[in-house]
Swiss-Prot record:
<dbReference type="GO" id="GO:0005829">
    <property type="term" value="C:cytosol"/>
</dbReference>
<dbReference type="InterPro" id="IPR002836">
    <property type="entry name" value="PDCD5-like"/>
</dbReference>
<dbReference type="InterPro" id="IPR036883">
    <property type="entry name" value="PDCD5-like_sf"/>
</dbReference>
<dbReference type="GO" id="GO:0003677">
    <property type="term" value="F:DNA binding"/>
</dbReference>
<dbReference type="InterPro" id="IPR022889">
    <property type="entry name" value="DNA_bind_arc"/>
</dbReference>
<keyword id="KW-0238">DNA-binding</keyword>
<dbReference type="Pfam" id="PF01984">
    <property type="entry name" value="dsDNA_bind"/>
</dbReference>
<protein>
    <recommendedName>
        <fullName>DNA-binding protein TSIB_0525</fullName>
    </recommendedName>
</protein>
<comment type="similarity">
    <text>Belongs to the PDCD5 family.</text>
</comment>
């Protein structure tokens, strides 16, 4: 009887360890894929943005990461569609940021 209980515990422990190992592998794979995508994104940004524009986007990413990510994704889509024919300067990036910010900004009004 005690041996049966011990056997059940051992099987349960092995099962839990196996599940934990699978979860860990899945998480590591997801992290690796995210890092690959980020590296590809940065490589494309290097190709289509001037150094000043990249610096600006990096600063925007510190303050408004969701806005910076949205701009990056839009720029990648345009690049992949062949709609970006020349490097984007800091001035062009400012205009793009302003346009996207205007579309996504939520307006708050305080009534007295």
């Amino acid at each position: 009887m005690a041996e049966d209980i011990e056997e059940i515990r051992r099987k349960k422990l092995l099962e839990l360890q196996k599940k934990l190992a699978e979860q860990k592998r899945a998480e590591e794979e997801q992290i690796r894929q995210e890092m690959e995508l980020e590296a590809q994104l940065q490589a494309i940004m290097k190709q289509i943005l001037t150094s000043e524009a990249r610096e600006r986007l990096t600063r925007v990413k510190l303050v408004r990461p969701e806005l910076a990510r949205q701009v990056e994704l839009i720029l990648v889509q345009l690049y992949q569609a062949g709609q970006i024919t020349e490097r984007i300067t800091d001035e062009k990036l400012k205009r793009i940021l302003a346009q996207i910010d205007a579309r996504t900004r939520k307006e708050f009004r305080i009534k007295w």
